[in-house]
């Protein structure tokens, strides 16, 4: 089993990660709260402070990107490479209504053709490792088979699965049966 510190917006900032890493059992990976691509040349002050290697000493930090726009994703990857990052995580798991209403996070999962085109482009053009955090669907666990088929087409660094659909947020029974079949489908 691998131990990772999942991102929680507004909580697991570099200050929290640094304190945790110093005083508790270090995690194998730490994920940043999601970065949303924007057109500015660089990250804003909060984002920059969160990803600066000097603020995250000794940690295997993976910046997380939340978008449904391949160009925005690729532009953000280029900015992150400037800070020395060679791995990013694509957030396809966020269930927040404000995120989902824009077709991002788990809101992207229902648009399988667009998702497949998006992944085609980012995996063809990005020269970093890309992992994906996903849910098993937006409305129903039956969506998982198609999502897994799509993911299997790409050289994912790893697939991190939250075994719930977007509609469940963080409540209800998990779809752990989907996960049991995950290794068979990969």
Map each language-model feature to its residues.
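Flavin-dependent oxidoreductase catalytic cores
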Residues: 1-186
């Amino acid at each position: 089993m691998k131990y990772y510190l999942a991102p929680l917006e507004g909580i697991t900032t570099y200050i929290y990660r640094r304190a945790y890493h110093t005083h508790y059992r270090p995690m194998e990976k730490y994920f940043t709260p999601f970065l949303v691509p924007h057109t500015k040349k660089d990250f804003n002050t909060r984002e920059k402070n969160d990803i600066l290697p000097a603020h995250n000493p000794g940690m295997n930090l993976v910046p997380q990107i939340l978008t449904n726009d391949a160009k925005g994703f690729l532009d953000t990857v280029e900015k992150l490479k400037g800070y020395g990052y060679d791995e990013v995580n694509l957030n396809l798991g966020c269930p927040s209504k404000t995120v989902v209403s824009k077709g991002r996070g788990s809101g992207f999962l229902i648009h399988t053709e667009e998702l497949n085109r998006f992944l085609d482009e980012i995996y063809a053009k990005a020269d970093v490792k890309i992992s994906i955090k996903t849910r098993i669907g937006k409305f129903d666990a039956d969506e998982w088979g198609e999502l897994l088929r799509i993911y299997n087409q790409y050289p994912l660094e790893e697939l991190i699965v939250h075994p719930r659909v977007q509609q469940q947020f963080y409540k209800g029974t998990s779809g752990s049966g989907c996960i049991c079949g995950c290794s068979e489908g990969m």
